[in-house]
């Protein structure tokens, strides 16, 4: 089925939120520096050891590499959001599945203690690293939205369902408003 103008506008709003959140330097561009700074912020917020902080930094640099963000490369937030919407909305089923699976790199970045689950403190550190305006209460609400079975942790499966909804969903959902905080 053809994507309607309102569905496209909603999807673009999600991608703009994502890109604005990733632009932690606030310069209007997405760059490798942003991903490195997210890792530094998470390490500080989560009080990671030097070793864990470096592991987290390396994982975020892998995300930057996956996105083609070599040192010195930057793309405007607006262009990144439009490109993401354009490419995601025309993906075939197999490509969508691969995109969702590739997002597990981000899961591994957020799972700083490497126990295979994202805890509330880990998710909160990530959310507040990309959204310093996100309060503790909002972070908890977002976490609880993603923790479908209410066991106090976000599993890889729960994360994949959320990513699929965020990247490909065309209708407003609670999940979309929890992944990077409220849509901007």
Swiss-Prot record:
Keywords, comma-separated and alphabetical: Calcium, Luminescence, Metal-binding, Photoprotein, Repeat
Pfam families recorded: EF-hand_5, EF-hand_7
Gene Ontology molecular function terms on file: calcium ion binding
InterPro entries hit by this protein: EF-hand-dom_pair (IPR011992), EF_Hand_1_Ca_BS (IPR018247), EF_hand_dom (IPR002048)
Lineage, highest ranks first: Eukaryota, Metazoa, Cnidaria, Anthozoa, Octocorallia
Binding site for Ca(2+) 1: 111, 113, 115, 117, 122
UniProt name for this protein: Luciferin-binding protein
PROSITE patterns the record matches: EF_HAND_1, EF_HAND_2
Organism: Renilla reniformis
Superkingdom as given in the UniProt entry: Eukaryota
Binding site for Ca(2+) 2: 147, 149, 151, 153, 158
Gene Ontology process terms (BP): bioluminescence
The protein's role, per its UniProt record: This Ca(2+)-dependent protein binds to luciferin. The luciferin of LBP is capable of reacting with luciferase and O(2) only when calcium is bound.
Limits of the EF-hand domain: 10-45, 46-81, 98-133, 134-169
